[in-house]
Every structure is written in structure tokens, then in C-alpha cells.
A protein has these predicted regions:
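Conserved polymerase palm-domain catalytic core
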Residues: 100-179
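Active-site-proximal segment of RNA-dependent polymerases
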Residues: 63-109, 114, 157-164
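Short, flexible, solvent-exposed loop/turn segments with mixed acidic/basic and small polar residues
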Residues: 46-49, 97-100, 179
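Short coil/turn segments at secondary-structure boundaries
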Residues: 35, 84-88, 140-142
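N-terminal low-complexity, intrinsically disordered segments
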Residues: 16, 22-25, 29-30, 70, ...
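Non-catalytic, polymerase-adjacent accessory regions of viral genome-replication enzymes
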Residues: 1-47
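Short, conserved non-catalytic motifs in the polymerase core
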Residues: 45-68, 87-90, 144-164
Length: 179
């Protein structure tokens, strides 16, 4: 029996190889990106948690939030996510996720505690370099722009997309084995 492995894919003619190309792709000036990267850790506000919640979430502020939206619209919009990935994917939600699990013999509902803060900057840089095939300098800059204090900030516009991609090498085979 052969396994059918379906991976996420980046539908783009050419990977981003330098800061000028990144600036063009995001329709921003290079200096804006570089300045925002330097200030990124201090460009978030902590979101007050709902009563009873223990999750620490953050919202990007000012130009960093603009950059996050552009990354979502100009880069993540070109990622084709497999059907088994539902979270934060356009036109997919908890309803479509529930439909996929209707009539299954086993249904497991789990939440990985502190998943976002456990995803380190090195993991994110690997996504930018290996999955997207961006150059190392571009990957480092994007990592600075999309992490807070060295990890993935839960609540940021880009974080769920990156969380979906951080296991891009391993998750497809696991999904195929589980059938």
C-alpha cells in the first residue's frame, strides 16, 4: 500500500532573494522593513485575556501590523495548504473542520499547550529558508518581523500561518499514515 503525501506548496515563480525584492513584494520601502525589524519586539501590545483564559496573546502595532498584513496578503496568499490544515486558512473554519471529522471512528480534540511560544525563531527562519526558498538574509529579516522575543507571538496576523508551516516536512507523512 503506497501512501499519498500531500504537502503545502508555495505557488510563486521566483523566491525572494534580496531586500529589494522583499520590499517590492510587500510594496514597502526597504528602510521601513529594516527599521520595523529592529523595533519588532517592542511593537506589540499584550491582549487582555478573557476571564479564565491562560493564553498570552499579542497584537502587532503600527507599521509592524501593516507589514504583517502585507506578508499575509502577498506571501501567505500564495501558499496552497492541504485540506487537512484548517486553522487560519482562507475559507476554512471550525465548521469545515468539523465536517471533515463527521462519521469518523475516533475523534480526538486536543490543544497543544503553549504551542506558539514553543515555536522558536530558528524554526521560523527555517520555514522562510527551506519552505519558501528565500535567501538567508531575507529569512532572517522576516523572522525578526514575525517573532517576538525569539518565539512566535500568539495572536499576531502571521503567526497561525507560520504555525501551520512549521511542521511542513513531517506533518504530511503523519497525515498520510493516519489516513
Amino acid at each position: 500500500m503506497s501512501l499519498i503525501v500531500i504537502k503545502p506548496s508555495y505557488l510563486c515563480d521566483e523566491p525572494i532573494r534580496n531586500f529589494a525584492a522583499l520590499a517590492r513584494a510587500l510594496r514597502l520601502e526597504e528602510v521601513v522593513l529594516q527599521d520595523a525589524a529592529v523595533m519588532a519586539n517592542s511593537s506589540y501590545r499584550r491582549v487582555v485575556p478573557a476571564p479564565g483564559s491562560t493564553r498570552e496573546t499579542f497584537d502587532a502595532l503600527g507599521i509592524l501590523k501593516v507589514i504583517h498584513r502585507r506578508i499575509k496578503d502577498k506571501i501567505f496568499a500564495k501558499v496552497q495548504f492541504p485540506d487537512y490544515l484548517q486553522g487560519s486558512v482562507k475559507h476554512r473554519d471550525y465548521v469545515s473542520n468539523a465536517r471533515k471529522h463527521t462519521n469518523q471512528k475516533i475523534l480526538i480534540c486536543e490543544d497543544v499547550k503553549k504551542f506558539f511560544p514553543s515555536v522558536q525563531a530558528g524554526n521560523i527562519e527555517d520555514v522562510w529558508c527551506a519552505f519558501f526558498a528565500f535567501s538567508q538574509p531575507v529569512a532572517k529579516l522576516l523572522t525578526q518581523l514575525t517573532t517576538k522575543d525569539g518565539s512566535l507571538p500568539q495572536g499576531a496576523i502571521t503567526s497561525s500561518y507560520l504555525a501551520n508551516l512549521v511542521l511542513w516536512r513531517d506533518e504530511p507523512l503523519l497525515h498520510a499514515k493516519m489516513g
